[in-house]
């Protein structure tokens, strides 16, 4: 990030206690921390935990995990419940956080969860 996302002024590096050198806008007089998207992905299991559900998205040939972006003012946990309902119409019975990972190509921090849904199959 080279320019302030509020005013467009060129940022300079400035020392911030306990943080190190952080981009700073001399016009707004504010530190500018990185901005990135936040998403969730889910390893989705049936109640018996012996089947893994993956989806096929928008005509792409490979199956993927159920995933989606976290909306503004939404928690990752609320997003996973919403995305599961939107993507496959199922309710989440349980979930457990697994790990997070940053993807530079899409500037996205993804929170990965294991999820148990309310059905043995999508046909129920």
Model-derived segments and spans:
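Short glycine/serine/proline-enriched coil/turn segments at secondary-structure junctions
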Residues: 34, 62, 104-107
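Active-site-adjacent beta-strand/loop module that shapes the phosphate/pyrophosphate-binding cleft
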Residues: 93, 101-124
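Acidic, metal-coordinating catalytic segment for phosphate/diphosphate chemistry
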Residues: 1-42
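Conserved beta-strand segments that form the floor/walls of ligand-binding pockets within enzyme
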Residues: 24, 64, 112
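Structured beta->alpha junctions
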Residues: 17, 46, 69, 101-102
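Conserved Nudix-box catalytic region and its N-terminal flanking loop in Nudix hydrolases
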Residues: 43-87
């Amino acid at each position: 990030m080279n320019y302030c996302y509020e005013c467009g002024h060129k940022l300079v590096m400035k020392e911030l206690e306990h943080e190190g050198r952080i981009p700073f806008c001399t016009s707004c007089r504010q530190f500018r921390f990185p901005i990135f998207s936040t998403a969730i992905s889910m390893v989705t299991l049936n109640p018996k935990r012996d089947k893994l559900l993956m989806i096929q998205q928008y005509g792409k040939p490979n199956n993927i995990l159920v995933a989606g972006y976290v909306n503004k003012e939404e928690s990752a946990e609320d997003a996973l419940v919403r995305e599961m309902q939107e993507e496959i119409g199922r309710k989440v019975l349980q979930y457990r956080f697994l790990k997070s990972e940053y993807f530079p190509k899409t500037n996205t921090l993804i929170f990965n969860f294991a999820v148990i849904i309310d059905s043995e199959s999508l046909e129920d």
